[in-house]
């Protein structure tokens, strides 16, 4: 019985799942929008939102915790220097999931996951790239 077991397995073992979400979280922080399957996007929220909450209070201990979870110093820098101050007044809900149809190969539902309130210049570039 799987009572009280939260999170989706996604047909992967635990180390693969952990590595995948670590990479996806780093990509989302770096680019502020990524395209993935809808199910992975929903799971990714559970990884990224606590990282941003951690970045709202800058300390050496919090930076080390963020590094332990992402293993990427560049991502930790962006979290604490840009995203933490940007979301200082927001009490959660830092990501938005936008459904974008089905993948051509296997009809998997796809979605964009983006950080709320990302700069307008980046949004304009993404729209042009999509067209």
Swiss-Prot record:
<keyword id="KW-0687">Ribonucleoprotein</keyword>
<comment type="subunit">
    <text>Part of the 50S ribosomal subunit. Contacts protein L32.</text>
</comment>
<keyword id="KW-0689">Ribosomal protein</keyword>
<protein>
    <recommendedName>
        <fullName>Large ribosomal subunit protein bL17</fullName>
    </recommendedName>
</protein>
<dbReference type="InterPro" id="IPR000456">
    <property type="entry name" value="Ribosomal_bL17"/>
</dbReference>
<dbReference type="GO" id="GO:0006412">
    <property type="term" value="P:translation"/>
</dbReference>
<comment type="similarity">
    <text>Belongs to the bacterial ribosomal protein bL17 family.</text>
</comment>
<dbReference type="GO" id="GO:0003735">
    <property type="term" value="F:structural constituent of ribosome"/>
</dbReference>
<dbReference type="GO" id="GO:0022625">
    <property type="term" value="C:cytosolic large ribosomal subunit"/>
</dbReference>
<dbReference type="Pfam" id="PF01196">
    <property type="entry name" value="Ribosomal_L17"/>
</dbReference>
<dbReference type="InterPro" id="IPR047859">
    <property type="entry name" value="Ribosomal_bL17_CS"/>
</dbReference>
<dbReference type="InterPro" id="IPR036373">
    <property type="entry name" value="Ribosomal_bL17_sf"/>
</dbReference>
